[in-house]
Amino acid sequence: MNPTKLFLVFVAFAFAIINALPVCRQGTFDPDYNGIPDYIIVGSGPGGSRAVQQCIAKGHKCTLVERGYDYFEVPYVQTPSASFLVYSSPAVRYASTVSAKNLFNLTVNAIEANVVGGASSINGLIVVITDIDNFYRELNITGWSYEELLPRYLELMTSLNRPEHTGPLDVSDTPVSDPAYQAYRNAIRQVFPNIPERLPDMNTAFANQNGTNFPGFGPPETSTKTTYMNFAGANVPIVSYRESAYMAFVHPIRNHPNFRLMTRSRVDKVVFDVCKTRARKVIVTATNYFGSQYQCELTARYGIVLAAGAIRTPQILLQSGIGPANELSALGISVVKNLTDVGRHLDDHPTIVRQYIGPIPDNYYSANINGHAYWNYQDNASVIPNWAMQIAGVPGINFKTVLSVLQIRNHVVQ
């Protein structure tokens, strides 16, 4: 080889070494940190937790990368009744969008999980089987129809109302005799006298009807694992804790030799090969226990699974060069794939939840028991017409959660 060319190759090689990021040691396997995982799963919410469980079950070495804290670093997430403590803890991050044109240039505030288990570690513990309309049967994608996926949903759960299934996720039912549910039902009947009640619970009714003719209400199942003890022939609940995705899927494999967990580690981008066809490396910004940040990289032998949620997954894709080419180029991001819909069409949650503290208005219908349920046929006519169910919290603390079914017709949402 020409000496000049040899020198240039040497310089390029040296430059690459000098600028290379260190290996993310927390995500490797061998003592010398050269043992790379077979797969990297980004995000430890329900999707990522289930993915890593299946990854280990198939005999692979798998690293789960989570931006937030380890599960037991935030003790409140284990207690079902401690939501108000969770929302003021490090398990939660608060984010705001930029002004959105389709929302009259208003911003949207979002609560994001910042702990292993993702949203399942901080949410309202309601277990809902995805509605049949969300399976996109018109796309005719093999293996993803409602009929094919419903058995998989059922196989994930262990429920008193579906004893034929024993999955890793324990769910608890809400008895029809529960005073809070009775108040809820009475309130609904006052406003919607003809709406059908779905028993023994919403999920079982949905499964029994094959997802057809489903609109209605019923007792919810909750993602709590409850231990019962028999007293005088009756099963009495003794203790209950949150059955998060972490507890159901990750905790049982926590000490498996093929499993690694990186916490406080934010994936900034996915790195593709020169042909822009394969991705086997992620760039990570990690935070140590002293609060100092550093960048590192982690390589997978076979592939990377993005399961960082409805907000952060498209963000990582965009930062990696996958998205609207003109917008990426304007930001100086090298385009890997022009996909115009990435980062758009966000559809993340079936309800709108509003919480506030204040007196109970006199014009509310109410079932007057502890855990009051209130209905107001028009919450604020000057802003938006809607139906609003309100459930008061702990007696003595007038804290109400509002679930709204919005009927929007050219009104500003505030």
From Swiss-Prot:
Entry's family note: Belongs to the GMC oxidoreductase family.
PANTHER family named among the record's database cross-references: CHOLINE DEHYDROGENASE, MITOCHONDRIAL, GLUCOSE-METHANOL-CHOLINE GMC OXIDOREDUCTASE
Protein name in UniProt: Putative truncated GMC-type inactive oxidoreductase R832
Keywords for this protein: FAD, Flavoprotein, Signal
Lineage of producing organism: Viruses, Varidnaviria, Bamfordvirae, Nucleocytoviricota, Megaviricetes
Signal peptide positions (record): 1-20
Any GO molecular function: oxidoreductase activity, acting on CH-OH group of donors
Cofactor(s) this protein requires: FAD
Annotated organism of origin: Acanthamoeba polyphaga mimivirus
Binding positions for FAD per the UniProt entry: 38-67
